[in-house]
């Protein structure tokens, strides 16, 4: 994934920011961070993004 890549689900546009981990129950789980226009980040587990997100959010570049 390239920083700055934009995706949309038809109602809003999100911009890929970074991949980082969050510790949940002693396990490091990779999460994907996206910027939104309203300045509230969208944070989604990488596994969930790979399974579902890429199909729901189409690349708009």
Q: What label would you give each PLM region?
A:
Residues 11-15:
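Short, charged beta-turn/beta-strand-edge "cap" motif at the junction between a beta-strand
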Residues 1-10:
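Short coil-to-beta transition motif at edge beta-strands of beta-rich domains
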Residues 17-46:
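Basic/aromatic-rich interaction segments and small domains that mediate binding to polyanionic partners
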Residues 39-61:
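Intrinsically disordered, low-complexity, charged/polar segments
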Residues 1, 16-18, 61:
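Compositionally biased regions
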Residues 1, 30-31, 52:
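Coiled-coil-like amphipathic alpha-helices with heptad-repeat character
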């Amino acid at each position: 994934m390239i920083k700055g890549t934009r995706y949309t689900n038809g109602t809003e546009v999100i911009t890929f920011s970074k991949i980082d981990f969050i510790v949940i129950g002693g396990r490091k789980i990779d999460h994907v961070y996206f910027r939104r226009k309203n300045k509230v980040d969208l944070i989604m587990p990488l596994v969930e993004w790979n399974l579902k997100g890429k199909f729901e959010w189409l690349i708009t570049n």
